[in-house]
């Protein structure tokens, strides 16, 4: 069945200080969820922006450099595995998005977020279904977030050989699940995720040691307003 086609997005905000926000890494079993916020410069257009998942790696890397060079402002946000375990992945994603927008060197007047919900924050905003293919600023954010997280997975692959992280980027593929149940759970795995929790019970920790569990406390009003 063909994917549902969405019409071009029409935003009520017509100014130039529009930030697009997207995330990468909600589904993986390991590592941070990474977000990005981008304000594009109308005077320096970036041809070829599209959903990062639909681009070849070569084109994605070229656009990554173009965005860093030509965007009016950009910022990355993140929540680590320990924060994901404390908050849950959905709330952690909201917090990581908030961190990305807070990090922009130019304050946005309006924010568009990929998906169907926005975090609770001070900026006027709205969610955009399939925004990474309908809004250029969100497309740019998706590219920055994906390239950043992919590189982090390649670095973790060096730290923790045998899991195949450079290939599957931490997603629960058969290769990853087999390695998890053979090698054990690393300090970067998300212990609140069921396959990781099961491997921890069955096999234990990778290398026989684990990082200390950090106590984390967050006010509830950081997160999405669902009223």
UniProtKB/Swiss-Prot annotation:
Its cofactor is Mn(2+); Mg(2+). Belongs to the RNase HII family. Keywords: Cytoplasm, Endonuclease, Hydrolase, Manganese, Metal-binding, Nuclease. Its EC number is 3.1.26.4. The gene is rnhB. It comes from the Bacteria. The lineage of its organism: Bacteria, Pseudomonadati, Pseudomonadota, Gammaproteobacteria, Pseudomonadales. Manganese or magnesium. Binds 1 divalent metal ion per monomer in the absence of substrate. May bind a second metal ion after substrate binding. CDD domains: RNase_HII_bacteria_HII_like. NCBIfam families: PRK00015.1-3, PRK00015.1-4. HAMAP family: RNase_HII_B. Its main location: cytoplasm. InterPro entries: RNase_HII, RNase_HII/HIII, RNase_HII/HIII_dom, RNaseH-like_sf, RNaseH_sf. This is Ribonuclease HII.
């Amino acid at each position: 069945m063909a994917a549902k086609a969405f019409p071009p997005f029409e935003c009520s905000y017509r100014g130039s200080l529009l930030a697009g926000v997207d995330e990468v890494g909600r589904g993986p079993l390991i590592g941070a969820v990474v977000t990005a916020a981008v304000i594009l410069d109308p005077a320096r257009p970036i041809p070829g922006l599209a959903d990062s998942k639909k681009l070849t790696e070569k084109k994605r890397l070229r656009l990554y450099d173009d965005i860093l060079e030509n965007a009016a402002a950009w910022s990355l946000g993140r929540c680590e595995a320990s924060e994901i375990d404390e908050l849950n992945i959905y709330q952690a994603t909201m917090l990581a998005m908030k961190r990305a927008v807070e990090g922009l060197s130019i304050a946005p007047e309006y924010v568009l977020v990929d998906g169907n919900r926005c975090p609770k924050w001070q900026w006027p905003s709205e969610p955009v279904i399939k925004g990474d293919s309908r809004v250029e600023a969100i497309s740019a954010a998706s590219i920055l977030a994906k390239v950043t997280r992919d590189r982090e997975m390649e670095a973790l692959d060096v730290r923790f050989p045998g899991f195949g992280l450079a290939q599957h980027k931490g997603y629960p593929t058969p290769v990853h699940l087999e390695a998890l149940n053979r090698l054990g759970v690393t300090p970067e795995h998300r212990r609140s995720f069921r396959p990781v929790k099961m491997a921890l019970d069955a096999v234990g920790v990778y290398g026989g040691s684990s990082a200390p569990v950090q106590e984390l406390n967050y006010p509830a009003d950081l997160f999405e307003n669902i009223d």
